[in-house]
């Protein structure tokens, strides 16, 4: 149990350190992926900013189910959940003030669109050790399971 909590914290710290991620939405019934940046993390909540004029904003309004993937040095973290648009003004202001790119692109935070992702499921995959580590965390139910990492390490 304690090992699982530690592994989950390792995965969340990985997101802090690798905040440029692949972000997947749906455009109609087709998947659409782009590079996005996690602007802030509070526990299991990830915050994002975009323009209300961008396609991603319209896609999220139509279908708030998303998945994201961070990857570096043989480690990947994949998160899944449903975004919501209830972001406090103080968080919006903090995001705008603490990201130098946003102030170059936008006059103020008030004209931007913000959303957050409460992580429902998280996969942590590390290919470095033998056998590799693959943990699946369901943060809604609290269940933790080991994922399939290859036939050589399949449970018998």
Explain the meaning of each model-derived region.
Residues 1-19, 152-153:
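N-terminal leader/targeting segments and the immediate start of mature chains
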Residues 2, 78-156:
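Charged, gly/pro-rich active-site loop segments
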Residues 13-28, 66-70:
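A short, Trp-centered hydrophobic/proline-enriched beta-strand micro-motif
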Residues 22, 46-47, 78, 123:
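General beta-strand recognition
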Residues 35-37:
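Conserved beta-strand in the GNAT
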Residues 39-74:
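A short mixed-secondary-structure module that forms the rim of ligand-binding clefts
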